[in-house]
A protein has these predicted regions:
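Cytosolic-side transmembrane-helix boundaries in multi-pass membrane proteins
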Residues: 191-198, 202-205, 276-321
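Single transmembrane alpha-helix segments in multi-pass membrane proteins
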Residues: 12-61, 65-69, 73-74, 78-95, ...
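Transmembrane alpha-helical segments in multi-pass inner-membrane proteins
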Residues: 218, 228-291
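Transmembrane helix-bundle core of multi-pass membrane transporters
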Residues: 106-178, 281-286, 313-321
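Short loop segments and helix-boundary regions at transmembrane helix junctions
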Residues: 36-40, 79-141, 239-240, 244-256, ...
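Helix-loop-helix "hairpin" substructures at the membrane interface of multi-pass membrane proteins
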Residues: 154-233, 257, 261
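Hydrophobic core segments of alpha-helical transmembrane domains in multi-pass membrane transport
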Residues: 27-28, 52-56, 106-110, 163-176, ...
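Loop-to-transmembrane alpha-helix initiation sites
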Residues: 95, 122-127, 160-165, 207, ...
């Protein structure tokens, strides 16, 4: 037991928590913004899958990780706007649209990968891992001064570029939501669309903007998965992170800081599962750990929220007397 605890107290373990949390943070920010706009996007998983595939393919054919990243971002935005078109313009249930995107993200990406590689490589490939080299992946960054600090330097320095962008975007998204007119409009539309419309806010445009933002974040998350976390795209590589992000958004109370901390909790759970597997624990027992933590976290969040609601109702009842 003591040896296992020593493994958890290493800088490498904390470094892995941050690394694993990055794609969850991107997807959590996507969930937060659309929730502020008054609707849910459960298609985060599928959006990340499409972004991951397009990013890795464009990176290979353009021989540049930058163009691959740009392709992933564009894919995420365009597909999220397509979701918005079906939901807002055609009045399709947005939950059903999200389910459809998630299903397409699994089977559709595999189909596209096989078709594209068959046309360009002469054979159908079920993944792009054989195409992407280290030079085509998004680079890691070593922070000169911080890297020399004992323990902390090994935890903070040496991460992928997108990992630092994920944490920076937590701050920038919070500023956008609470310190800018756009953020005010997003929150107004989410709280009372009729009131927002009465003062000249275009509810439809704001919803499209929120949807586009969620797609942008999923683009970052997908690019991270196929061009940083792994070298290339493979089937179902997102592995439920889109759904975990929905849980992180709920646990974080719909706020950027809370969502980031919740994502780190889930990152810790996944890193713990990997450690358990490394020391010989059956993978069938280790792999469910992140999902068990997700369920436990949501139960705790629901209990705390319900307790707060009961206290508010009790206080309101006393004041009315």
């Amino acid at each position: 037991m003591m040896n296992f605890l020593k493994l958890l107290a290493t800088p490498e373990f904390f470094w892995s928590i941050i690394r694993i949390s990055a794609p969850i943070i991107f997807a959590t920010l996507a969930a937060i913004v659309v929730e502020k706009a008054g609707f849910a996007n459960i298609g985060l998983e599928g959006l990340m899958m499409f972004a991951a595939l397009s990013g890795s393919l464009v990176s290979y054919y353009a021989k540049s990780w930058f163009w691959g990243l740009l392709a992933a971002l564009v894919t995420g935005v365009l597909m999220s706007l397509m979701m918005g078109f079906f939901a807002f313009k055609l009045k399709t249930d947005i939950i059903l649209v999200g389910i459809a995107i998630n299903m397409m993200g699994s089977g559709g990406t595999l189909f596209l990968c096989k078709v594209i590689t068959n046309l360009t490589q002469g054979k159908s490939m079920a993944s792009t891992t054989g195409l992407i080299t280290k030079s085509l992946c998004i680079p890691d960054l070593t922070i000169p001064v911080i890297s020399s600090i004992p323990f902390i330097g090994k935890v903070i320095s040496g991460h992928n570029l997108l990992t630092y962008i994920a944490f920076l975007l937590c701050l920038l998204t919070s500023i956008m939501l609470y310190k800018t007119p756009l953020g005010l409009n997003i929150r107004a539309v989410g709280e009372n669309p009729n009131a927002a419309s009465s003062v000249g806010v275009s509810v439809l445009n704001i919803k499209y903007i929120a949807m586009g933002f969620s797609g942008l974040m999923c683009g970052f998350g997908g690019a991270f998965m196929s061009m940083a976390y792994a070298q290339g795209w493979s089937l179902d590589m997102v592995a439920g992170r889109g759904f975990i992000a929905l849980a992180a958004q709920a646990m974080g109370g719909g706020e950027c800081l809370g969502g980031m901390l919740s994502a780190l909790v889930f990152g810790f759970a996944q890193a713990l599962g990997i450690k358990f597997s490394a020391i010989g624990l059956d993978s069938n027992l280790a792999s469910p750990i992140p999902y068990a933590v997700t369920i436990i976290g949501l139960v705790i969040f629901a209990l705390v929220r319900n307790n707060k609601i009961k206290k508010l109702h009790s206080a309101a009842a006393l004041e009315s007397k």
